[in-house]
Amino acid sequence: MSAKIKSGDDIIVLTGKDKKKIGKVIKVIIRNAKKKVVVSGVNVCKRHTKPRAGSGGGIFNKELAIDVSNVAILDPKYKTPTKVGFKIIDGRKVRFAKVSGEVID
């Protein structure tokens, strides 16, 4: 099964407090038929950490996961949100942007 959003993709947030922010996908989480993505610089919270042996405590920024339905891949040509399609080129299945037809990977 091919994934429409993969690590390293440039995406834009469609809804929520970080609407219209652009970032790169750090990690894709699939758990119990729910798909979420962690995006750099988006959905950031403060994490208060207690000092432990080997590491000091403090307040750190942490990116939380966003549901995959709230993000869209950026079109490589026009830099707008786009849907993703699949086609076979030279016997290899590739993703392409539906807006411009450009191959994503």
Swiss-Prot record:
It comes from the Bacteria. The keyword Hydrolase does not apply. Pfam families: ribosomal_L24. Belongs to the universal ribosomal protein uL24 family. Keywords: Ribonucleoprotein, Ribosomal protein, RNA-binding, rRNA-binding. One of its GO terms (biological process) is translation. Disulfide bonds: none annotated. One of two assembly initiator proteins, it binds directly to the 5'-end of the 23S rRNA, where it nucleates assembly of the 50S subunit. One of the proteins that surrounds the polypeptide exit tunnel on the outside of the subunit. Transmembrane segments: none annotated. Part of the 50S ribosomal subunit. This is Large ribosomal subunit protein uL24. The keyword NAD does not apply. One of its GO terms (molecular function) is structural constituent of ribosome. GO terms for cellular component: ribonucleoprotein complex; ribosome. InterPro entries: Rib_uL2_dom2 (IPR014722), Ribosomal_uL24 (IPR003256), Ribosomal_uL24_CS (IPR005825), Translation_prot_SH3-like_sf (IPR008991).
